[in-house]
Structures are given as C-alpha cells and as structure tokens.
Swiss-Prot record:
Protein's recorded name: Potassium voltage-gated channel protein eag
Top-level taxon in the UniProt lineage: Eukaryota
Subcellular location: Membrane
Composition skew (Low complexity), residue ranges: 815-833, 965-977, 1049-1093, 1149-1167
Modified residues (Phosphothreonine): 787
Intramembrane segments: 442-467
UniProt family annotation: Belongs to the potassium channel family. H (Eag) (TC 1.A.1.20) subfamily. Eag sub-subfamily.
PAS domain: residues covered: 43-97
Transmembrane segments: 227-246, 269-291, 314-335, 343-369, 372-393, 471-493
The gene coding this protein: eag
Species this chain originates from: Drosophila melanogaster (Fruit fly)
Length: 1174
C-alpha cells in the first residue's frame, strides 16, 4: 500500500475476534456473551457452534436471560444445585467451572414425531456440557460481560436413557452403540475417556482455561508477541537506514574490487569491513523472520507463522545469496584463473542487496529530500559502474599489447610508463604504470563527460573495444540523463500518481486538522480512517469506474461485489438472477473505523445493514445490549411496518468494519416488483437486532443502590412532625381532594359570586369555592389563619354541632333569631339570601350535598387502578420494572398551581379595570369642582330611564319620584359572610315617605331599628351639612372572593325624596320591618356629624369610591323602593319556616309570586330614605 507503511494501527476492540479464534482452536467448543450490568444478564452474542449445540438460531438466543444459564435448555434431569451454583457465580461476578446437563432442541420429522396435523414436533435431547463462567472486565476494571464457554462431554459420561428419549428416538441397541462409539472417537484425539465416576470431577480441572489469557473488553493497540518487531518502530527504522547505507557500500566496492582485481586477503582492513557487512546482512535476514508486515487489506500481520512463510516466499533466497562470504572463499585460493576467479566474479551477486532498497522504496518516497538524494546517488552509482567497466577495457587492451589505448596515453602523460616482465610460466606481465587512484579518477571523469554530453576530448576512445563501449555508454547516459534530470517530475507523477494523490489527500487532512485545531485523539482517528479507506479502495472511485460500464455489465460487477451477502444469508437463496441484479444495483458498500457511530439514538432508520467483516456494539442507555459480528443483520423490518422508525440505541464500530447497506425506499421498490421473492424474503430474513425496539431494563447498580437506600431509611430515626411548622402550613394550603362534583364549574361562571351590600345593619356576602378541600380539625384552623393573613374575614363565632363541610359545593351560613333549626338551602334567586342575627347567635354551617359514600367508592376505584397499573409489566425480560402513575397529591398540587395562576391573572384584570374607573372618576370630579358646577343635591334624570351609579346617588338625594325596575336573578349559593364595617352618612332634619310591595319571597331591611344588632362595635359616622344629600347607610366590604369576576353595571331606577339613615335593626325573611332609632343613637349620630367634614366635593368622592366597590360585588338582580319607603328584595325560594316579626317600624310586604322577578311599588312611611343597590 503506497504511503501506508504503518498499516492500520488504530486502537481496536478485538475482543470478539480473539474469543472466536480461541474457540475455533478447541474442538466442539462454543460460547455465549452476556451483559453483566443489566438485571437477568441478557445474552448479547452467541457463536455458530452454540447454535448447533442448542438447536436455536442466533435471533432466538439473543436477549434471553442468562441468569439461569439458558433456562430454555433446562429439563427434568437438570441438577438444581448446579443451577443455584451458576446463579451464585453470576451474582458475585466470579469465575467457576462445572458440568451441567442441558437439553437440545431437535426438529424431528418422522412417523413417531408427527402430530395429528402432520406437523413436525419439537423434541429435546439431553447432553452433558462442561460450562466455564469467566467475568470480562473493561479498561476501568469493571465487569461488563460474562463469557460462558460450553464443551460437549456427553461421550465421556454414562449414557442418558430417559422415557422420552426412548419413545421419541426409538433407537435400537445397535444404533445407540454406534452413536456412542462415533461420539467417543471425536474426543479420543483430544481428551482421555473417563469411565470411573470418581474421576469425572477432575474433568473440569483438566479442561480449564487459563485466566491469564482471558482478553478484556476494551480498545487496545495491536499487540505483538515479545519476539516480534513492529515494522514501523524506531529501532527498525534506524536499522533500515543502516542497511541502505551498507547496500550502497556494497554496490560501490563490489564493482571496484572486481575491476581492479583487488584481493581483500592482501588488504586486511577491507577484509574486516566486508566481513562485518556480511554479518550485518545476515542479522537482517534473521530480523526479517521476526518483523511484522502490512497485509493486503492494510492490516498489520503479527502472526509468526504467517511472517515466516511470507518472507520465505519473497526475498529470502536473494538475501541469502547476497550474504555469502565470497571474500573468505577467495582468500584461500591462490589460483587466478581457476575457481578463485569464479568466486571473485560471484561477488557481483552482492549487488542483489539493492533489492532491499527497492523493497523499502515506498518508505523513502514519503520524503522529498530523500527522494532527490536517492536519484543523485543512483546517477553517481551508474557512473561508477561505467568507470569500472572503462578501466577493465583499457587494462585488457594494455595486457594484449595495444599501446595506443587510453591507459597507455595516461601513463605517458603522467610519466609513469608501463613495463613488461617476462617469465617462463606466465609470459610477459605488465607492471608499473600510473597509480590506481589516477586510473580510477580518469575513468570516472570520462564516463561523467559522456553521460552529461559535454565531451572535452582530453580522454577519448581509441581502440575498437573502447569505441563500442563508448557508443553504448552514450545511449545509456542519454536515457539516464533525460530520465533523471529532464523528466524527473513527469516520471514520478506517472509512476506514483496514486501515491501523489494519496499524499495530497493526507496533506489536506493534516492541514485541515491544524487549521481548525482539531484535538489530537480525533485527528488520529480521522487519519486512520483515511488510511484504511485508501487501503480498501486504492484511491479508486468505484462509482466513477462503474459508470464506464453498460448497465448489464455494471449489474454483474455489483453482484460480484455483494457476493458475500447473497451467499451467506438464506433470504436471498430463492431470489432470481434478475432480482439479485436489481438488489445489487442498490447496495452500497461502506467502511467504518473503530469508534464510528453508525446510528444515533432517535435517528431515522432508513437502511438495512449487513456486516461483512468486523464487529459492532449496540449501546442503549450507556449499556451494551448486543454485539454484532460477521454475518449479522441490523436495521428495521421495513417490509412489515411501512412507517419510518427511530433508532432506540447507538451502533458503534469496535473494529474496522465493512458494511453492505441498502436504502429503505430501494428495498421496498424491489420487493414490490418481485412479489414472489418478497414473501420468501420476509419469511427467511431474521434481523439479529431490530434498532426500533427499545429494551426496558434495570441496572444492577441501580438495584443495589435502591436496596442500600431502603436499608438506610429503616435505620434512620423518624423525625417528629410539627403541625405548626411554617412549611407545613404552606403545604396544607395547597392540598385539594379529588374532584367529585362537576357542578362546581358552573358555580364559578355563575352570577352569584358578588356580595350584596345593604345598609341598616344587614350584612350578607356570597363566596363560591369551586374546589373546597376536606379539612380536618388542625387543617381547618390553619385555613382560617390563612384567610386572615390574606386580608379576608372569618366568622369568629364557634361552629355549631350540626355544621358540615361539603366537597365541591357551597356552604350556606344562615343566622337565626332564637332557637330555630338549621335549614338547607339548595338555590337562591337573588343575592343576599343569608342574613345575620343578634350578637349572641352563632353562624351555623349547613351542608348542601353529602357524598361520603360516593367519595369512598371513587377512592377505592382509584386505588384499584393504581394497583393494576403497578402490576403491569413491560414486554421485556426485566420483571422488576413497574409503571407508576402520578400520585393524588401530585395531581392536586398541579391543579392548585394552575388555579392560582388563573386567579392571579383575574386579579390583575380587575385591578386594571378599577384603576381605569378611578381615573375616570377623578376626571369627572375635577369637572364638578370647577366654577359653575354648584353644590346642589339634585341630579338630572336620564331620559332613557337608565342611570349610572353616580346618577343613582344623586337621584337618591332628591325628593319625589319612584321607579319600578324589573330584574331577574339566576340561582346562586351563599356562604358565610364576614362582618363588615358600616359607614353612615346622614343629614339631620330630612324626612321622607313612601310605601312598597315586593313580589316574591325574600328579605327586606327596615329603615329604623336598634343599633348594634349585627356589629355593635361598628363606628357610626354622620355628616352634617346643607348639601341636600339624605342619610345613606353604606357598607364597605373589606375582602372579596378572589375568583369572583367584576359584574357589569346594573340599571337602577331614579328615586326622589329625602332619606334619613339610622343604624340597622332586626333582619327578617320575607317581611319588611322598621324600628325608630333610640335617642342615644340619634345623639351619637349628632356628635359624629359635628366631627365629619362638610365639603360636598369630599363627600362625593368618598361616595364614588364606595360605589365602585358596590358595583364590583353586586348581583344582577336589584330592586329599589321609593325614597323614604320600605324596600324589599325578592328571593327565588320561600323559606319553609315563618319569618319572625320585629317591632319598631311600619311597613308592609306582600309576596305575590315565587318567581325570580320582582316588581316593587311603594306605599307607606319610614324614618329615613334608603338607596338600595339590589
């Protein structure tokens, strides 16, 4: 792989590959992997051998509980003690080994195994297995997986004969004997046969696996054995550069020694150097047997056997020939022409060491400077070789007596002539002449001038041999010069175009990482992915190449590329050639690096993925729920559910993975066209893991934590609960009981949420509570205290014995004079149905609706529903998970918070409305106080008969006139009204007369009576002056219901006359009564009037402010009598008891109807005039 000299060295989690390799090395061995962090320890992986032993496929075994070691394989002969021992081992995360009897599922289809419907029945076969349990730890030293290894030892045990096996298998004695012999032979080569039952217990110890070699589940860099060197380590890199230098030394010295016939035996220094070089090259051969190399797929091969075979098949012979000690052989032979010259010529074989340079050329090509140096050295090396050949030709011609060769001319120029020595044995011998150094330099000078096409001519070819060699050298030099100096860039680009592209890609990636300051860990992952992708594709664009081919040829190539998927999965066996070609055209091949996330949680599942190589893990809630390997399929069942699903887990690559995936739309398109194949595909394709399905489980750590908390709560002392604590008071305010009656919503929106305010001592207020909680004694006290804190008023009288609190209803408070029984009122047609009695009478709370039995029934049904919901378990192996609905207190708290939010919003709206009205009143007051407004007491009448609240007050101050308004009041409910402050504004000497008749039953207030019956301590304020305003009894409300919206203004009839106010008398029901004011009260009025302001403007402003309070709280049904007459207000229901009669006044009220409509007409006399806002 160009540029990929290191190979794929990124940390990988090779746990699964190591376990599979170890299991395959042992006969009849299978294993399971279970998650140790999830309750019941679900199975996350099983190999093919286990599927054969158990009779189940991988999809059936995955996610099953391993707490009882494949409980689906238990039978009647399975030892209970062994099961308990296994469970104890898993719970305590220990390592153990024992024998266990399990049952294999067999699909027998014979005459005895067929049911009445003709279907094959599933039978089970007992078999003995040796089980080893080993905990697997991760990089944090936590046990994350359990490895369960099984080995079939049935042949070493006594035959198991049960009634089921005898009846089902129906084997004869001969068949059983043949079966036992066959199974025994399978183990004879590996395990001894144990017939003694006492020795069977030692079988587990004999077949135990060493815990030291147990791999860990973590990412690790590729490990090598201790005696194996990594080809990219620092020592090997330095060693390769030393070998490169020695190779150049060999390439220089070998031609020199051969040409100049230099005997190293005569030069001891050269002999020592050459011997050291030979030893170093021999050591290099040994190191090559223990050095890793990069495989075809880019992986680092560290297996010693594979390394040795690879080296023996490649460079071993050449390296061995180049390391032979030829100088040693030549040193012991003195014969120049014999075998010694042959050994001297064999020194040229050492030039084969240049193959080491070619072998590692890809490493040197990564550096530009090294490449230039290598090219220059190669050019000089060729010139050196040619110089040696040029000297050999000149020496040969000189020895032959040719005296005009270049060597004789050099001797003459240097004045070192040659001379001959004659001997009888060898003939004439050429001696003396130029020095060896001068001859070599001259030869090298000539070759360099020829190769560079310079040719100075001082050294030239003279003989025929020299000329022929010069011609050849010129040709070689021209090619070499053009190649090295003229077209270096072009040749390198043509020869290493893929390498240049690869380096360009790597440089771009490096610059990108440096520019954006990508972290080092992520940068290394990106670089490893780029290198691995290059190793798989070699820089080729697959789509671009396929586009060169026609459609038919492209389909054939795609089928060939996806042949592993089509051949391994049974779902494609029945597919036709056309169907396979259509599917292959849509398959996409992808390569993933370790740590890559293929799917994220919540991501749409739009592909069906087939794993060709590598392994992946499925992570849900930070726990490994499945480990997928070669041949597994994951995704979603598009052909069964057309909706696009979301991934419930993350899928992360553990190693370098090759995946073949097909898009959902493309797959459905092919299945829709090939309908016959679609049925077979849906039936035979089984997903190893469906990403849409979410597993519900509980972690072991969570269960332990819950147990510890439970124990801690038991040991902690109980803290005393103080009912008067401030926090407990606040929480008691937000408590609500479940909603029982739906009519409370109607009461909230009704018109009975306003208070009716009357003068003359009669006070009545209506409040509606849509959700009234059921209060205990302590809670009731807190509730009253909370009401006072909010600014409201609470009836301080002790509750009677008959008082009750009704859920979702309205409590009606009625005051009685004397010992009268309580009356339950269900509806009222007009506001102000409740009346107050004397000082000694207490308010009685009467229950409207009693639903105790119904509340108990609803509470019992709610408890049953909660119990059934707790008993509901999810569809998973975890039987401890329960779905808990929100509690009653939580629902009540949420409802209370929402109600408070609505109340706050309504209060803000009311405040805005009141601020707007005050601004309008101030503007009107400024106009009235302007010059010309006067201080008259009469107000102009409205031509339409309808008046504003301000006009009503003015109308009440005049004399004469009467009104007959007709109003209709919807039914309302009344609650206990708090005591209000009564403010009286009066003018002495005013009197009026009138009479009134009220249609319907109701309550009326007389114009005069005893003071202090309702509130003896109330301050009576009188105002004296000649402003024309009659005495007016008003009541200012101190607090209103929070949930009562402000009603619109009501139409009041114009009245005329002068009114005189007195303290309130006795309140009745259905009758109009009056009483003269006492002298003490009149004196008190007079004394108070002397202290009151006499400014008409101030009185008018005060009245307008009070009017706004009345308008916000009044009911739609109102009636008013004539000035100075008795006023009556109708009530929608007639009391069942006769109304009491009070003395002290005159007047009459005749009820003529029981409807909600009242038409009062006045006739009679009274001591004061009154403006009634009802």
């Amino acid at each position: 792989m160009p540029g990929g000299r290191r190979g794929l060295v990124a940390p990988q989690n090779t746990f699964l590959e190591n376990i599979i390799r170890r299991s395959n090395s042992q006969p009849d061995s299978s294993f399971l992997l279970a998650n140790a962090q999830i309750v019941d320890f679900p199975i996350v992986y099983c190999n093919e051998s286990f599927c054969k032993i158990s009779g189940y496929n991988r999809a059936e075994v995955m996610q099953k509980s391993c707490r009882y070691v494949c409980g689906f394989m238990y039978g009647e002969l399975t030892d209970k003690e062994t099961v308990g021992r296994l469970e104890y081992t898993l719970e305590n995360q220990q390592q153990d080994q024992f024998e266990i009897l399990l049952y294999k599922k067999n699909n027998l289809q014979c005459g005895c195994a067929l049911s009445q419907f003709g279907k094959a029945q599933t039978q089970e076969t007992p078999l003995w297995l040796l089980l080893q349990v080993a905990p697997i730890r991760n990089e944090r030293d936590l046990v994350v997986l359990f490895l369960l290894t099984f080995r079939d030892i049935t042949a070493l045990k006594q035959p198991i004969d049960s009634e089921d096996t005898k009846g089902v298998l129906g084997l004869s004695k001969f068949a059983k004997l043949a079966r036992s012999v066959t199974r025994s032979r399978q183990f004879s080569a590996h395990l001894p046969t144990l017939k003694d039952p006492t020795k069977q217990s030692n079988l587990a110890h004999m077949m135990s696996l060493s815990a030291d070699i147990m791999p860990q589940y973590r990412q690790e860099a590729p490990k090598t054995p201790p005696h194996i060197l990594l080809h990219y380590c620092a020592f090997k890199a330095i060693w390769d550069w030393v070998i490169l230098c020695l190779t150049f030394y060999t390439a220089i010295m070998v031609p020199y020694n051969v040409a100049f016939k230099n005997k190293t035996s005569e030069d001891v220094s050269l002999l020592v150097v050459d011997s050291i070089v030979d030893v170093i090259f021999f050591i290099d051969i040994v190191l090559n047997f223990h050095t890793t190399f990069v495989g075809p797929g880019g992986e680092v091969v560290s297996d010693p056997k594979v390394i040795r075979m690879n080296y023996l098949k490649s460079w071993f012979i050449i390296d061995l020939l180049s390391c032979l000690p030829y100088d040693v052989f030549n040193a012991f032979d003195r014969d120049e022409d014999g075998i010694g010259s042959l050994f001297s010529a064999l020194k040229v074989v050492r030039l084969l060491r240049l193959g080491r340079v070619v072998r590692k050329l890809d490493r040197y090509l990564e550096y530009g400077a090294a490449m230039l140096i290598l090219l220059l050295c190669f050019y000089m090396l060729v010139a050196h070789w040619l110089a040696c050949i040029w000297y050999s030709i000149g020496r040969s011609d000189a020895d032959n007596g040719i005296q005009y060769s270049w060597l004789w001319k050099l001797a003459n120029v240097t004045q070192s002539p040659y001379s001959y020595i004659w001997s009888n044995d060898t003939g004439p011998e050429l001696v003396n002449g130029p020095s060896r150094k001068s001859m070599y330099v001259t030869a090298l000078y000539f070759t360099m001038t020829c190769m560079t096409s310079v040719g100075f001519g001082n050294v030239a070819a003279e003989t025929d041999n020299e000329k022929v060699f010069t011609i050849c050298m010129m040709i070689i030099a021209a090619l070499l010069y053009a190649t090295i100096f003229g077209h270096v860039t072009t040749i390198i680009q043509q020869m290493t175009s893929a390498t240049a592209k690869y380096h360009d890609m790597l440089n771009n990636v490096r610059e990108f990482m440096k520019l954006h300051e990508v972290p080092k860990a992520l940068s290394e992952r990106v670089m490893d992915y780029v290198v691995s992708t290059w190793a798989m594709t070699k820089g080729l664009d697959t789509e671009k190449v396929l586009n060169y081919c026609p459609k038919d040829m492209k389909a054939d190539i795609c089928v060939h590329l996806n042949r592993k998927v089509f051949n391994e999965h049974p779902a494609f066996r029945l597919a036709s050639d056309g169907c396979l070609r259509a599917l292959a055209m849509h398959f996409m091949m992808s390569h993933s690096a370790p740590g890559d996330l293929l799917y994220h949680t919540g991501e749409s599942i739009d592909s069906l993925c087939f794993i060709v190589t590598g392994s992946l893990e499925v992570i849900q809630d930070d726990e490994v729920v499945a480990i997928l390997g070669k041949g597994d399929v994951f995704g979603d069942q598009f052909w069964k559910d057309s909706a696009v699903g979301q991934s419930a887990a993350n899928v992360r690559a553990l190693t370098y993975c090759d995946l073949h995936a097909i898009k959902r739309d493309k797959l459905l398109e092919v299945l829709d066209f090939y309908s016959a194949f679609a049925n077979s595909f849906a039936r035979n394709l089984v997903l190893t893991y469906n990403l849409r399905h979410r597993l519900i489980f509980r972690k072991v750590a969570d269960v332990k934590r819950e147990k510890e908390l439970a124990e801690r709560r038991k040991n902690e002392p109980q803290l005393p609960q103080n009912q008067d604590h401030l926090v407990r008071k606040i929480f008691s305010k937000f408590r609500r009981t479940p909603q029982v009656q739906a009519g409370s919503k109607e009461l909230v929106g009704g018109s009975g949420q306003s208070d009716v305010e009357k003068g003359d001592g009669e006070v009545e207020r209506t409040k509606v509570f849509p959700k009234a909680p059921k209060l205990q004694a302590s809670q009731a006290t807190l509730a009253r205290q909370d009401t006072i804190d909010e600014g409201g008023e609470v009836d301080s009288s002790p509750p009677s014995r008959d008082s009750r609190v009704v859920i979702e209803g309205a409590a009606v408070s009625s005051a009685t004079v004397g010992p009268s029984p309580p009356v339950a009122t269900t509806s009222s047609a007009a506001a102000g149905a409740g009346v107050s009695g004397g000082p000694g009478s207490g308010g009685t709370v009467v229950a409207i609706v009693t639903k105790a039995d119904r509340n108990l029934a609803l509470e019992r049904e709610r408890q049953i529903e909660m119990a059934s919901s707790r008993a509901t378990t999810s569809d998973t192996y975890d039987t401890g998970l329960r779905e808990t609905p929100p509690t009653l207190a939580q629902r009540d708290l949420i409802a209370t918070v929402l109600d408070m939010k609505v109340d706050v919003r309504l209060e803000l709206q009311r405040m805005q409305q009141r601020i707007g009205r005050i601004e309008d009143l101030l503007g009107e007051l400024v106009k009235r106080l302007a010059p010309g407004a006067g201080s008259g007491g009469n107000a102009p009448d409205n031509s339409s008969g309808q008046t504003t609240p301000g006009d009503e007050i003015c109308a009440g101050c005049g004399a004469g006139g009467g009104g007959t308004p007709t109003t209709q009041a919807p039914p309302t409910s009344a609650v206990t009204s708090p005591v209000d402050t009564v403010i009286t504004i009066s003018s002495p000497g005013a009197s009026g007369s009138g009479s009134g008749t009220g249609a319907g039953a109701g309550s009326a207030v007389a114009g005069a009576g005893g003071a202090g019956l309702l509130n003896p301590g109330a301050t009576v304020v009188s105002s004296a002056g000649g402003n024309g305003l009659g005495p007016l009894m008003l009541k200012k409300r101190r607090s209103k219901s929070r949930k009562a919206p402000a009603p619109p203004k009501q139409t009041l009839a114009s009245t005329a006359g002068t009114a005189t106010a007195a303290p309130a008398g006795v309140a009745g029901s259905g009758m109009t009564s009056s009483a003269p004011a006492s002298a003490d009260q009149q004196q008190q009025h007079q004394s108070t009037a002397d202290q009151s302001p006499t400014t008409p403007g101030a009185e008018l402003l005060h009245l307008r402010l009070l009017e706004e309070d009345f308008t916000a709280a009044q009911l739609p049904s109102t009636s008013s009598g004539g000035a100075g007459g008795g006023g009556g207000s109708g009530s929608g229901a007639t009391p069942t008891t006769p109304p009491p009669t009070t003395a002290g006044g005159s007047g009459s009220g005749t009820p003529t109807s029981t409807t909600a409509t009242t038409t009062p007409t006045g006739s009679g006399t009274a001591t004061r005039g009154k403006l009634d806002f009802l």
